[in-house]
């Protein structure tokens, strides 16, 4: 281990042999840091926190501090961070609230400076949370989603995989997979074509998704009727099936379209 002489690292913390801890950082008793990870200067990692392999934690990050929720009374809760995550300056991640509750972050994510992951959130893998992106409690971000800068996401919202949220948006309802959305409140603008192509979704599948989006967001039908029409008229490719199931299972409702979809 390479621990700067000004850092304070608990004897009870479990750090892999090659972990680096920078100046003036504080590592608490129940912290586990896996091989290849780096903790920058002036960081605080406290509580029940597990950090995976090859993570980069930059200056001023605070991981595992008490959840910002009035119902929390000191229960043992957890923060679990996977491998190859980049957590930039002054980000804050809180653990769960209930006894045994967890905030869970997957692998290969980028959290830009000042972003916040609140209690009981789940972030998948290959996501980007841009500067000052704010996830309230119990938010779920699926794989390969992009959250723009200064976005605020309401409690319990689900953000579907391969979706992208424009900067400064206010998100109060679920964001469907594969969508592009923006606004205050956020509204659907169409498919995230760039994201779909970058993830090697073929043209036929994209065409089926376009058809599904027109029915779901441009037909004027009630959601349950639009879902029935999609199931009846469109081939249930894996992408279409995932979209249908996501919308059918939404608890907060789905963000609606702001205009006619092409």
Language-model features, listed with the residues they occupy:
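Terminal amphipathic alpha-helical/low-complexity segments used for targeting or macromolecular assembly
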Residues: 1-6, 11-12, 17-18, 54, ...
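Structural signal for interior beta-strand "rungs" in well-ordered beta-sheet cores
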Residues: 2-187
